[in-house]
Amino acid sequence: MSCYGGRPAMEEHRTMRGVNPAVIIGTPGRMNDHLRKRNFDTRFVTALVIDEFDKCLEFGFHDEMAEVIGQLPALKKRVLLSATDAEEIPQFAGVGGEASGNAASSSRVIKLNFLPEEAVSERLNLQKVISPEKDKLETLYRLLCTLGDHSTLVFVNYRESVERVVSYLKSKKFPCDAFHGGMEQDDRERALYKFRNGSCPVLVSTDLAARGLDIPGIDNVVHYHIPVNEEAFTHRNGRTARWEARGSSFILLHAEERLPDYIPEDIPVFGLQEQTPKPAKPRWTTLYIGKGKKDKLNKVDIVGFLYKKGGLVREDVGQVDVQEH
C-alpha cells in the first residue's frame, strides 16, 4: 500500500489494519507519522528500499530518513537507489562498514551500476525544432498537432510556465494537463491518471515528472525550455525509450538560442508542416463515478452499467479502477 501526505492519515491506518500489507511504499514524513503511532509492527520489517536517495538528500530529507531507519530494528537488507554516484554514503544509512559503525556490514555491501555508457540511448531519436519567434508557444502547438494523439511529456523550467503553456494549448482546443509541485495532491493524481490511461495525451510538467515517474509507453519528450543541466536533460529523456521501447526527444529552440555543450550540435532538425493538422482527439475519455468499494461497488457493476445503459461494447471500455472511496 502507499502512504503520503495530502490525504488523511487515518484512512491509511485503517487500510494497514485491514489489509496487513506485505509492502508499504511511502514518503519519509508520512512513514514517520505511522511509525510514531505504531500503526504497523516493525518487528517484521526486514528490508528497506530508499528510492531517489540522492534527491532525498538534496531536498533535505536527511533527518526524516534517519528517523525512519532508527525505528526499524529488524532490518536485514537496505537498498539505496540513486541516479547519480555518491562519493560518500551518510552514516545514518547503516551501510559501508566503518561509516555505519557496523563492521559486519562492510563485506556485504554490493554496488550495482545500471547506467548506460552512452549519454543518449540508441533507441532515442533526438531532434531539434526551430521556432521563428522567441515565444515558442505557437511552435509547440504546431509540433504537438503534428505528433497527433501519441503520449507526450512537455518539460518547462518553472511552475508559472506550466500554467502559461497549458492555458495557451487549451485556448487552442488542445487536450492537455498540468503537473507540478505547487498543485494539490488530488489534482496531480488526477492528471497522472488521465495521462496514463490515454484520455489526456499531453502532460506539461516541471522536472518533478523527470524522476520517479514510471509510465510505460510514453512516445515523446519535448524540452520547451532547455534543461538547467545535463543531469536534468538525461532524466527528462529517460521518461521515453524505456526498456526495449523506442521514443523521440524534441528540443525547442528559437533562432538566437544555442544548445549547451552536453547536447550534440549536429542533431537533425525536425521540420514542421506548413499546414498544421487539427488537434487529435484522445482515444479515451475518463469517466468518474463518485462511489467506491465502501459503497459495495465493483468492476462488474460498472462494466454492466456501461454495457446496458451506455450501449457500449467490450472494445469501448478500457481500464476500470475501483478505489476505496
What do these predicted ranges mean?
Residues 1-36, 44-47, 167-171, 175-179:
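Conserved nucleic-acid-binding Ia/Ib motif block in the N-terminal RecA-like helicase ATPase lobe
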Residues 11-15, 163-167, 175-206:
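Conserved helicase ATPase core of P-loop NTP-dependent helicases/translocases
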Residues 19-35, 192-211:
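Conserved two-lobed SF2 helicase motor
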Residues 40-119, 263-264:
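Post-DEXD/H (motif II) to motif III coupling segment of the RecA-like Helicase ATP-binding lobe
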Residues 122-168, 311:
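Conserved interdomain hinge at the start of the Helicase C-terminal
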Residues 211-226, 248-251:
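A short beta-strand element within the Helicase C-terminal
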Residues 229-232, 237-269:
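Conserved segment of the helicase C-terminal RecA-like domain
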Residues 272-325:
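Non-catalytic terminal extensions of ATP-dependent helicases
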